Amino acid sequence: MKKLKVFLVVSLLCCGLSMSMAEAKTMTLDKTKVLVPQGFSVANDDLKFKKGTVVELNENNEVITGVLNRDIALRPTGWRNVINDYYEESNNSIFYPRIFHPFTSVSIPFPTYAHVRYKGNKPVTFATDGTVLSGTIDEEVTVSVNKDKYGLITFEDQYELGFYPDGSVKNGRLRDDALLRPYGFKTGLAGDEMAGFVEFAGGKDISFSKEGYVTSGVLKKAISWQQPDGTMVTLPAKTMISFINGQARY
């Protein structure tokens, strides 16, 4: 009976390992080619992945992660919270617009349909619904940090913008200084007059918890912080600070 139990446990472990190995695989592309990301119901001929790069595929040969061949508009996982409703396209051709004005560039707004332009030659990761969990954005994006709370932040282009599966922001680069709550603020900033909001520096990387609290970022000004053991520390400005389980580290 004991041998049977051991056999069953080993068999289950082997089956689990086989299933996990079957669920995802990688492939190096010998040429730039059209591949279909997971969650797509209609293939896009313009969505190509770069030659010589590695793509991660699921069991249906759909792309989980891959390197884009060129800039392309895709829908981010947090698209419901994004307020980029239009993008501008400029042209000074004699054929566009119809009335030609020499040395004049005309910008015309086009609806985005909740899409964001992602940068080519950079990796993107797709969620199971076909939206982009993470990728390098090629335009500034203004979005609610948490899907259930009010508050808009603009993230810089040319940097990665990541989302949690529920659409809340996971990480990005702040365009401007912003007042935000660090993770663990209830104990770390007990009695604070600003209700736990402190200023984080723009032009720096930042990451958030699913609830919209800062888990790492660069402070604009030094602040006092109470660690879980009750000790008080000064967190310096212009330094990347991590907030983990109520403890601040740098």
What is the role of each PLM region?
Residues 23-250:
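Glycine/tyrosine- and acidic-biased, solvent-exposed loop/turn segments at the edges of beta-strands
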Residues 1-8:
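Bacterial N-terminal signal peptides that target proteins for export
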Residues 9-18:
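Bacterial N-terminal signal peptides
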Residues 3, 21-24:
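N-terminal Sec-dependent export signals
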